[in-house]
Structure formats: C-alpha cells, structure tokens
Amino acid sequence: MRQRQERLSALIREEISEILLRRVKDPRISSFLVITEVKMSKDLRYAHIYVSVYGSEEEKKQTMQGLESAKGFIRSELGKDLRIRFVPEIFFELDDSLEKGDRILRKLKELGLEDEQDSE
C-alpha cells in the first residue's frame, strides 16, 4: 500500500504542476510556485499538497487564496487526467522549508563556512 501512496503522490504532483502551469488562469497564483511534496492519506482519499512560493508575504497570501479558490477546478482536472476511481480531496499548505534553507545558506556564506565545504 505504501508504494501505491508514493506512486499516486508523484503522479498528482506532476499533474497539478501541469494544471497550474497551463490551465489555471488566476492572476493571484504566483509563477514562482513550486510543489515541494504531496502526502497521501493511507486510504488515498486526501492529498496534502505542500507549495513553496517565492515572494513577499502578500504574494504568498494571494497565491494561497488563488489556490484555494481554484481547488475545485484543479480536482476536476485531476479526475480527467488521472482516470482513477476516486479523486482525492486536495488541501494546499504553504511550505517554507526552501526559504529557510536559503536563509541558512546565506548565513553560512556570511560566516565563510560555505566556501570551506566547497573546497573539500
């Protein structure tokens, strides 16, 4: 079952990326959006989609509102594309791990620690 969860997660991640890129026309949704992870529930009925948005807090807020309002459309498009018996309910969640990682790298660079690791 775990393998099926992972396969479906990867497939949903690809499909939603494509849907957001080509079919969703909401101007609130930032073009600097990355789907970092999709976690499926054990029964495959729920998909938590973690997104990272590069931009200001206002842009992040607008993007999340746009995703929330497009959720029904995205789910219906998933149903057409995936041809699975039950299309999972989707939940978008903001993921700031990429931003945190970027901040850590900048701090290391300021301290001169990043260059030492690169030279090894």
From Swiss-Prot:
Sequence intervals crossing the membrane: none
Location, primary (coarse class): cytoplasm
Subcellular location: Cytoplasm
Any Pfam family the entry gives: RBFA
UniProt keyword terms in alphabetical order: Cytoplasm, Ribosome biogenesis
GO molecular function, one term: ribosomal small subunit binding
Keyword match Cytoplasm: yes
GO CC list: cytosol
Biological process according to GO: maturation of SSU-rRNA
InterPro entries: KH_dom-like_a/b, RbfA, RbfA_dom_sf, Ribosome-bd_factorA_CS
Family: Belongs to the RbfA family.
Described function: One of several proteins that assist in the late maturation steps of the functional core of the 30S ribosomal subunit. Associates with free 30S ribosomal subunits (but not with 30S subunits that are part of 70S ribosomes or polysomes). Required for efficient processing of 16S rRNA. May interact with the 5'-terminal helix region of 16S rRNA.
Subunit text: Monomer. Binds 30S ribosomal subunits, but not 50S ribosomal subunits or 70S ribosomes.
Entries under HAMAP family matching the protein: RbfA
Protein name according to UniProt: Ribosome-binding factor A
Organism the protein comes from: Dictyoglomus thermophilum (strain ATCC 35947 / DSM 3960 / H-6-12)
